Amino acid sequence: MMRQYELVERVQRYKPDVNEALLNKAYVYAMQKHRSQKRASGDPYFSHPLEVAAILTDMHLDEATIAIALLHDTIEDTTATRQEIDQLFGPEIGKLVEGLTKLKKLDLVSKKAVQAENLRKLLLAISEDVRVLLVKLADRLHNMRTLGVMREDKRLRIAEETMDIYAPLAGRMGMQDMREELEELAFRYINPDAWRAVTDRLAELLEKNRGLLQKIETDLSEIFEKNGIKASVKSRQKKPWSVFRKMESKGLSFEQLSDIFGFRVMVDTVQDCYRALGLIHTTWSMVPGRFKDYISTPKQNDYRSIHTTIIGPSRQRIELQIRTREMDEIAEFGVAAHSIYKDRGSANNPHKISTETNAYAWLRQTIEQLSEGDNPEEFLEHTKLELFQDQVFCFTPKGRLIALPRGATPIDFAYAVHTDIGDSCVGAKVNGRIMPLMTELKNGDEVDIIRSKAQVPPAAWESLVATGKARAAIRRATRSAVRKQYSGLGMRILERAFERAGKPFSKDILKPGLPRLARKDVEDVLAAVGRGELPSTDVVKAVYPDYQDTRVTTQNNPAKAGEKGWFNIQNAAGMIFKVPEGGEGAAAKVDPAATTPKPGKRALPIRGTNPDLPVRFAPEGAVPGDRIVGILQPGAGITIYPIQSPALTAYDDQPERWIDVRWDIDDQMSERFPARISVSAINSPGSLAEIAQIAAANDANIHNLSMVRTAPDFTEMIIDVEVWDLKHLNRIISQLKESASVSSAKRVNG
């Protein structure tokens, strides 16, 4: 275990003016607090925070961050308090130690929800101070290094979470060395057989090619030296996880991989990077399509380097990375390499780390999504997806660079520029040409968004976008628009209900009734009434507890809408709302347009349904030509019944659930609808065949036939047929009745 003076010396190597008192005090305090604790391995618990601190010294972090690492488990696992740490080390260190503690104190139902909420809390904490991320990643790295002592199920859970969240997060924040080590450790426990096989093959390959690698390294160094470029060249081998992932994703065998070895060239200046590139390309043949310039266009995590692939001395492909030494440090340590020292000689002023980086820009965008939705697991999936995605770089007409994941569309671009631009997007010009909004953007595209103040993002856009930010914003806008529609409908229903009750009505009048209705605000009440979840009479009674409902309930028939017992209200947009007399809730919105179909699928041919609610037919079915009614099923959408269905009697006393609907059939209609016929046939040879022939002659499809009762001289059966409409069905029934083999035939409802 590292001694106190050894820790101080490690920091002094890169920061000679280190605050030794702070480090010594944190070391002694943490050691005393953890002195009676052991890890699962049997080692003293203090060895863990000490190793976390050591990892951070390898990243050349300041003494304040090292102190936070030493203290990070004290509040959670010992008698230490926030107040005590504030007094000894200052409130800022105390705040960060407490913040790291809170990340662990979660009590949710599903593992996925725990992981999602952990990620949310971590990202929010990072947004306040990036040192939370640095300590958290170092903490996870040491836990992964010592994971072997855990139970197998726990090892697997921690390894999967590391692979899904912590490794890609380290990469997204530019910390490539840490990302690679986390991936390798996780791979070892997630798929030990594959890890062992790939590791063994890589060791064999390295031994076989050691001489060749040394030759290429020497050749490169000599070329640079002859041309006056001060450069260091270092060979590197792909890590086992990187190799395995490529084999899996591209379906390759180990022997088919051609770029397992690579070289890193480090020079002093950007100019030398391009000079070195020119020398390499004039000495060896380059592989077309494998050149990437991340110096002129850095990655979103601030990674900068030139990548190229050449054909080496033995005709094998060799990948080279050319960068300055400063770029190399940023590539290894990411945001930690952006530290700006502001030492004022006090522990109360810990050193800050710059947030003016591309990695932080990604982080800020991700944080914005936290306010766009309330489903943590959904947020987790979107964020995990974006952590792994490759990028394309596009430009606004004014030259602003916008980084997007591969597969992004102009809609993603619009939301990346600003949420308001995304919400008002109606079209896009890509490189000066108007293109569909589903167009996949490519590197270098210039995108000009066409906007309209009247635009509301349609829900269908969600399937066209690749970024979590766009997806969350579309959901928010869709929810807001739907809620606004329902609120407007609820307002009109309540106005009528209060009028019938002889009571005054306004939004403010509803406020005293909120506790009785268990609703958070007035808009929530209005939307619930509009959706049919909350009867209007319940609202009247909540506001006026002495109100008595004296209505006489009768069977309400939506087919008689416009007659006594019903009234219509129409808004400025032409939407008609049919409401039962007495104000007992809404039937539903009657939209002049049919329900919007999903892509590639025609909607049900029904007018009068809310486009935001699912619609289905009742089991007994209805066919065009039937008089139909919709019944609002709270939480399950709308069910369509034929008006003669006996099942409707169950809703006689719930008029607020009845919806006036009608068919929306055109000449191009090619759909068939299920109907049921009860047939009593004479029990003689060939009678069943004759029934089938009648159906076939009328172009009807029998998809089910069941015998109900069989007697010596007749058979009763139920036939399910698919027909075009009511006329088609009646023609079949009429011909069945005329058949000598059939004694009776009639339609069955229910």
Curated annotation (Swiss-Prot):
UniProt cross-references to CDD domains, sorted A to Z: ACT_RelA-SpoT, HDc, NT_Rel-Spo_like, TGS_RSH
Q: Has UniProt tagged this entry with the keyword Flavoprotein?
A: no
Its cellular-component GO annotations read: plasma membrane
**What's its EC?**
2.7.6.5
Q: Which InterPro entries match?
A: ACT-like_dom_sf (IPR045865), ACT_dom (IPR002912), Beta-grasp_dom_sf (IPR012675), HD/PDEase_dom (IPR003607), HD_domain (IPR006674), NT_sf (IPR043519), RelA/Spo_fam (IPR004811), RelA/SpoT_AH_RIS (IPR045600)
Gene3D superfamilies associated with the record? 3.10.20.30, 3.30.70.260, Beta Polymerase, domain 2, Hypothetical protein af1432
Q: Which residues form the HD domain?
A: 45-144
Residues forming the ACT domain are: 676-750
Catalytic reaction(s) noted: GTP + ATP = guanosine 3'-diphosphate 5'-triphosphate + AMP
- Which PROSITE patterns would you find in this protein's record? ACT, HD, TGS
User: Which part of the chain is the TGS domain?
Assistant: 390-451
**According to its UniProt record, what is one Pfam family this protein matches?**
ACT_4
Q: Which keywords are on file for this protein?
A: ATP-binding, GTP-binding, Kinase, Nucleotide-binding, Transferase
User: In Gene Ontology terms, what is a biological process of this protein?
Assistant: guanosine tetraphosphate metabolic process
Q: Which GO terms of the molecular function aspect are on file?
A: ATP binding; GTP binding; GTP diphosphokinase activity; guanosine-3',5'-bis(diphosphate) 3'-diphosphatase activity; kinase activity
Q: Where is this region: Disordered?
A: 587-613
Q: Say what the protein does.
A: Functions as a (p)ppGpp synthase. In eubacteria ppGpp (guanosine 3'-diphosphate 5'-diphosphate) is a mediator of the stringent response that coordinates a variety of cellular activities in response to changes in nutritional abundance. It is necessary for persistence in mice, essential for intracellular growth of Brucella and required for expression of the type IV secretion system VirB and therefore plays a role in adaptation of Brucella to its intracellular host environment.
Q: Which family is this protein grouped under?
A: Belongs to the RelA/SpoT family.
State the PANTHER family in the record.
BIFUNCTIONAL (P)PPGPP SYNTHASE_HYDROLASE SPOT (PTHR21262:SF36), GUANOSINE-3',5'-BIS DIPHOSPHATE 3'-PYROPHOSPHOHYDROLASE (PTHR21262)
Q: What is this protein called?
A: GTP pyrophosphokinase rsh
Origin species, per record, is Brucella melitensis biotype 1 (strain ATCC 23456 / CCUG 17765 / NCTC 10094 / 16M)
Encoded by which gene?
rsh
